[in-house]
C-alpha cells in the first residue's frame, strides 16, 4: 500500500500497535514514506480507531474488510490451481489471523467450481496460534455461532489478532469445503518454521502454523496418508528476522513458559560458529557438520 501510494503521489497512513510489529515489516512502510503511527494498544485497538477515522476523514480503508483486497488475494488460489493443472489437492491449509486470506482463497475455490474449472473442492483448513485463537474457540465452543474477542498473545505477530474482521466469511468457507480449524503452540510454530527453512523455503512465524497444524491434523486422522496437501505461506522469512536469529541462537523462549520444553528444538537450531581465521579450523568445522548431517 505504501509503495503504491508513493508511486501515485498519494499520502499513506499505517496504524500499528506499539512494539508488536517486527521491524522487518515496519521498515517497508517507513522507507516508502508512509505516516507510520505506533498506537499504545493492540491490533484490534488500531482497527477500532481506523474504523472511526474513515467516518470522519476522506481516508480509503485497505485492510481485509476491503472487498477489493479479497478479490486480489483470490489470485493465490487461482494460480495454485492453474499450476496443478486444475486438479485440486485434497487439502489446503491456511494461517488464521484476521482471516482475510482464508476468506479469499475459499471464495476463489467456490467460484472456480461454479465455473467448472475444478470438479471438486479441496478441504480448506485454518490454523491459529494457541495464544490468538478466537476463531478456533468460536468453532469448537460455539459451533461458529459467535466469536468472543480476546487479548491475543503470540510471537507470530502477523496473526496476533483477537477479533478477526472476516470470521463470518471464513466460517462459510470452512463449512462449504468441509475443512477444519486447529490451534498450535509457540514451540510447535518455531519448530515448524525451522523445518520449512531447512527445506530451502523460509517463512515468517505466522506462516509456519500451517505445517505445525498439518502435523496435528495428521495425528487426528483428518488428513490421511497419501492425500495431497498444499500449505499456504503468507509471509517472507525476512519479515521477522529477529525471531529466526533468536531461535537459532537458543534464547527465543528464555523467560517464557516454553523455556524448559524448548530443549527439544535444539536439533533444529543452527547457530553461527565462531572460529579463528584458520583454514584448518574451517575444514574441521565443515567435516563435523557433514558428519552431523549425514
PLM features per residue range, with description:
Residues 10-46:
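A glycine-rich helix N-cap at a beta->alpha junction
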Residues 12, 36, 60-61, 181:
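Hydrophobic beta-strand scaffold residues
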Residues 56, 84-88, 223-224:
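Glycine-rich phosphate-binding loop signature in dinucleotide/nucleotide-binding domains
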Residues 186-242:
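Claisen-condensing/thiolase-fold acyl-transfer catalytic domains that form or cleave C-C bonds
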Amino acid at each position: 500500500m505504501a509503495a503504491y501510494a508513493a508511486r501515485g503521489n498519494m499520502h499513506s497512513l499505517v496504524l500499528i500497535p506499539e512494539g508488536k510489529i517486527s521491524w522487518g515489516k515496519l521498515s517497508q512502510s517507513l522507507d516508502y514514506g508512509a505516516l507510520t503511527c505506533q498506537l499504545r494498544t493492540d491490533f484490534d485497538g488500531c482497527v477500532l480507531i481506523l474504523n472511526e477515522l474513515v467516518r470522519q476523514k476522506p481516508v480509503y480503508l485497505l485492510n481485509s474488510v476491503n472487498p477489493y483486497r479479497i478479490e486480489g488475494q483470490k489470485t493465490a488460489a487461482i494460480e495454485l490451481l492453474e499450476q496443478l493443472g486444475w486438479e485440486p489437492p485434497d487439502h489446503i491449509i491456511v494461517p488464521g489471523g484476521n482471516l482475510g486470506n482464508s476468506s479469499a482463497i475459499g471464495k476463489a475455490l467456490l467460484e472456480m467450481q461454479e465455473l467448472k474449472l475444478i470438479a471438486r473442492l479441496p478441504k480448506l483448513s485454518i490454523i491459529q496460534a494457541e495464544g490468538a485463537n478466537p476463531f478456533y474457540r468460536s468453532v469448537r465452543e460455539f459451533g461458529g455461532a459467535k466469536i468472543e474477542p480476546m487479548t491475543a498473545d503470540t510471537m507470530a505477530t502477523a496473526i496476533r489478532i483477537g477479533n478477526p474482521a472476516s470470521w463470518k466469511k471464513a466460517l462459510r468457507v470452512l463449512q462449504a469445503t468441509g475443512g477444519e480449524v486447529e490451534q498450535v503452540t509457540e514451540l510447535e510454530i518455531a519448530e515448524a518454521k525451522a523445518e520449512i527453512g531447512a527445506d530451502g523455503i523460509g517463512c515468517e512465524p505466522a506462516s509456519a502454523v500451517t505445517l505445525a497444524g498439518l502435523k496435528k491434523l495428521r495425528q487426528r486422522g483428518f488428513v490421511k496418508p497419501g492425500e495431497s496437501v498444499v500449505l499456504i505461506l503468507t509471509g517472507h522469512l525476512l519479515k521477522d528476522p529477529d525471531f529466526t536469529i533468536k531461535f537459532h541462537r537458543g534464547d527465543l523462549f528464555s523467560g517464557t513458559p516454553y523455556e524448559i520444553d524448548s530443549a527439544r528444538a535444539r536439533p533444529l537450531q543452527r547457530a553461527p560458529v565462531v572460529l579463528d581465521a584458520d583454514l584448518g579450523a574451517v575444514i574441521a568445522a565443515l567435516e563435523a557438520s557433514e558428519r552431523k548431517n549425514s
